[in-house]
From Swiss-Prot:
Transmembrane segments: none annotated. GO terms for molecular function: haptoglobin binding; heme binding; metal ion binding; organic acid binding; oxygen binding; oxygen carrier activity; peroxidase activity. O2 binds at H60. This is Hemoglobin subunit alpha-2. The gene is hba2. GO terms for cellular component: blood microparticle; haptoglobin-hemoglobin complex; hemoglobin complex. GO terms for biological process: hydrogen peroxide catabolic process. Hb 2 is a heterotetramer of two alpha-2 and two beta-1 chains. Hb 3 is a heterotetramer of two alpha-2 and two beta-2 chains.
């Protein structure tokens, strides 16, 4: 699924509106993923607490959203722009790429809750397509 120029513009516009709450979105989305898909906890077993609101969840949620924010600036070539991150997840962290989609679903849920007026059907579509493209780019080194 490719991103049209309109999709890219919509993602950039929406990201601009929500970026001030990116940390909260990341922490909530990660908390939801860990609760709804408990099998994902295996990647974070070294943390002291996987509870929603724990310092580890908040910190990693922020890291995730900073990475997504960086990807927004690299939409023209996500594979090249996210190569280092793809290598990290594939070779060092060994994260099953299915988890990228699981996290994306939770990010969409949180965005819809936090921005009901701005997260229109068109924004939803564009952000979903972007997160799918992002997940695909992060999966590049798995092939």
């Amino acid at each position: 699924m490719s991103l049209s120029s309109k999709d890219k513009a919509t993602v950039k516009l929406f990201w601009g509106r929500m970026s001030g709450k990116a940390e909260l979105i990341g922490a909530d989305a990660l908390s939801r993923m860990l609760a709804v898909y408990p099998q994902t906890k295996i990647y974070f077993s070294h943390w002291k607490s996987l509870s929603p609101g724990s310092s580890e969840v908040k910190k990693h949620g922020k890291t995730i959203m900073m990475g997504i924010g960086d990807a927004v600036t690299k939409m023209e070539d996500l594979e090249r722009g996210l190569l280092t991150l793809s290598e990290l997840h594939a070779f060092k962290l060994r994260v099953d790429p299915t988890n990228f989609k699981l996290l994306s679903l939770n990010i969409l849920v949180v965005m819809a809750i936090m921005f009901p007026e701005d997260f229109t059907p068109m924004a939803h579509l564009a952000v979903d397509k972007f997160l799918c493209a992002l997940a695909l780019a992060l999966s590049e080194k798995y092939r």
